[in-house]
Curated annotation (Swiss-Prot):
Its main location: membrane. Residues 1-32 form the signal peptide. It comes from Mus musculus. It is found in: Cell membrane. Keywords: Cell membrane, Disulfide bond, Glycoprotein, Immunoglobulin domain, Membrane, Phosphoprotein, Receptor, Signal, Transmembrane, Transmembrane helix. This is V-type immunoglobulin domain-containing suppressor of T-cell activation. Residues 33-167 form the Ig-like V-type domain. PANTHER family: V-TYPE IMMUNOGLOBULIN DOMAIN-CONTAINING SUPPRESSOR OF T-CELL ACTIVATION. It comes from the Eukaryota. Immunoregulatory receptor which inhibits the T-cell response. May promote differentiation of embryonic stem cells, by inhibiting BMP4 signaling. May stimulate MMP14-mediated MMP2 activation. Glycans are attached at N49, N91, N127.
């Protein structure tokens, strides 16, 4: 009631549209590829040959209207993006170092690169490389490989790959080139730093525990001194009055008593002497015949004792 029915004819239309979108997206995903570098760092001694390699992963579009260009150039490491700057390798421009499909482009003959100690190679597995012969420290830098897919002379996809070449001068630098990944070296460095931090922490743990123990001892000693001082202050108060406390419900409020005060006074005795004298007052001298104990009258003899 009140809900319009959806026409059945719209369902096939939506299904056809979704199927077309899915096929277009899947076709784009299948046609996508990327460029990778097996090694990101090459270390070569001076005078050796350095071969830098890039690799295309994924299916590449095929057809008469599709052209794949692969080229090499020098660049620098940027803060945001690498391989943005284009510089020629040994005075060779970008057009001179281009591949066309799996073969070299027609305008880049083998004689021109070889005259400058360069050699380009490519295979059917997506690998393409450049070889620098008799390298010198001037050849050190960041090398980039660029792959461009053109359809009807319009660029469709553009991918980069980068690697660094370090040329070591001197006779003791070795005899062969070494290739490695910077990620591996970074992971090794991170593991070494973590291990060193653990060792330092274990060595510093006893010192930290000792400092904590000393601090607790000082705190306990200070607390004991405060308790002793409070106790001595409490004992120094003589005859304090009762503290007023709030009365409980149903009980009369206790009245506070004033502190007791007592003044010593002298009280005369029967003999005329003072039983209690003020401080620093000598006792009165005894009278003649007075002794401490009162004299007793003699007891008369009983008649019974005389008869005996």
């Amino acid at each position: 009631m009140g809900v319009p029915a959806v026409p059945e004819a719209s369902s096939p239309r939506w299904g056809t549209l979704l199927l077309a979108i899915f096929l277009a997206a899947s076709r784009g995903l299948v046609a996508a590829f990327k460029v990778t570098t097996p090694y990101s760092l090459y270390v070569c001694p001076e005078g050796q040959n350095a071969t830098l390699t890039c690799r295309i992963l994924g299916p590449v579009s095929k057809g008469h209207d599709v052209t794949i260009y692969k080229t090499w150039y020098l660049s620098s490491r940027g803060e945001v993006q690498m391989c943005k700057e284009h510089r020629p390798i040994r005075n060779f421009t970008l057009q001179h170092l281009q591949h066309h499909g799996s073969h070299l482009k027609a305008n880049a003959s083998h004689d021109q690169p070889q005259k400058h100690g360069l050699e380009l190679a490519s295979d059917h597995h997506g690998n393409f490389s450049i070889t620098l012969r008799n390298v010198t420290p001037r050849d050190s830098g960041l090398y980039c490989c660029l792959v461009i897919e053109l359809k009807n002379h319009h660029p469709e996809q553009r991918f980069y790959g980068s690697m660094e070449l370090q040329v070591q001068a001197g006779k003791g630098s070795g005899s062969t080139c070494m290739a490695s990944n910077e990620q591996d070296s970074d992971s090794i460095t991170a593991a070494a730093l973590a291990t060193g931090a653990c060792i330092v922490g274990i060595l510093c743990l006893p010192l930290i525990l000792l400092l904590v123990y000393k601090q607790r001892q000082v705190a306990s000693h200070r607390r004991a001194q405060e308790l002793v001082r409070m106790d001595s202050n409490t004992q120094g108060i003589e005859n304090p009055g009762f503290e007023t406390t709030p009365p409980f419900q149903g009980m009369p409020e206790a009245k506070t008593r004033p502190p007791l005060s007592y003044v010593a006074q002298r009280q005369p005795s029967e003999s005329g002497r003072y039983l209690l004298s003020d401080p620093s007052t000598p006792l009165s001298p005894p009278g003649p015949g007075d002794v401490f104990f009162p004299s007793l009258d003699p007891v008369p003899d009983s008649p019974n004792s005389e008869a005996i």
